[in-house]
């Protein structure tokens, strides 16, 4: 093998080129690659955190929705109970009012009936006395007539 100056010059030039690249070209390339790797790793970590946060937010929203539905159901049940209670109270009050009005009306009817009966008795007594006077055409005795009228009124 023949070593000549050209091969030796090329070898020295290649070694110098490699040293130059290792000194000035390689570090910025490695720094750029490491920076890009770090950005990608940070992006992936951020995406993972965002995904976990999203899952937590979904779970929290689901829990809050369940709680809100439960509270709404409780409120609806309370409103229904209150509505039933108000209706029952109104029915009871209406029944009491109806009973009171019926009793008052019956009392008024009874009083009117008694008054009408008494008025009728008085008119019958007057008609009986008038009829008796016309039949007899004269009064026998005022005391006897009043006894007869009282007996007649008592019989009615």
Curated annotation (Swiss-Prot):
GO CC annotation: plasma membrane; proton-transporting ATP synthase complex
GO terms assigned for molecular function: proton-transporting ATP synthase activity, rotational mechanism; proton-transporting ATPase activity, rotational mechanism
Location of the protein in the cell: Cell inner membrane
Primary location: membrane
Keyword annotations from UniProtKB, A to Z: ATP synthesis, Cell inner membrane, Cell membrane, CF(0), Hydrogen ion transport, Ion transport, Membrane, Transmembrane, Transmembrane helix, Transport
TM stretches of this protein: 11-31
Stated family: Belongs to the ATPase B chain family.
Assembly: F-type ATPases have 2 components, F(1) - the catalytic core - and F(0) - the membrane proton channel. F(1) has five subunits: alpha(3), beta(3), gamma(1), delta(1), epsilon(1). F(0) has three main subunits: a(1), b(2) and c(10-14). The alpha and beta chains form an alternating ring which encloses part of the gamma chain. F(1) is attached to F(0) by a central stalk formed by the gamma and epsilon chains, while a peripheral stalk is formed by the delta and b chains.
Protein name: ATP synthase subunit b
High-level lineage: Bacteria, Pseudomonadati, Pseudomonadota, Gammaproteobacteria, Enterobacterales
Name of the gene: atpF
